[in-house]
UniProtKB/Swiss-Prot annotation:
GO cellular component, one term: extracellular region
Keyword match Disulfide bond: no
Protein name, as recorded: Putative uncharacterized protein DDB_G0289443
LysM domain ranges (all copies): 32-78
Recorded superkingdom: Eukaryota
Signal peptide from the UniProt entry: 1-24
CDD domains per UniProt: LysM
InterPro entries assigned: LysM_dom (IPR018392), LysM_dom_sf (IPR036779)
Family matches, as Pfam families: LysM
Cell compartments where the protein resides: Secreted
Length: 79
């Protein structure tokens, strides 16, 4: 019974990751990164990456709400 519950838990985690692990880092399609620091905004990172804000947001699959909640320490794709 415990093995069955463990398998269900593992399946749940894998499904959850499939839906939440979709940024460029997990996809392996990025060659240049920017790590978010305290106080950073999407605009700050786009400027550091030398891309437009729109390009930065599309590359990282971000919307305006996600840019309000930049995750400190997270790697964001520049290209």
């Amino acid at each position: 019974m415990n093995k069955f519950l463990n398998l269900i838990g593992l399946a749940f985690v894998l499904v959850l990751c499939a839906f939440s692990c979709s940024n460029a880092e997990e996809m392996g399609s990025c060659s240049s990164w920017h790590v978010a620091q305290k106080g950073y905004t999407c605009y700050d990172m786009a400027t550091s990456c030398k891309v437009t804000l729109d390009q930065f947001m599309r590359t990282n699959k971000l919307d305006n709400n996600a840019c309000k909640l930049v995750q400190i320490g997270r790697k964001y794709c520049c290209n």
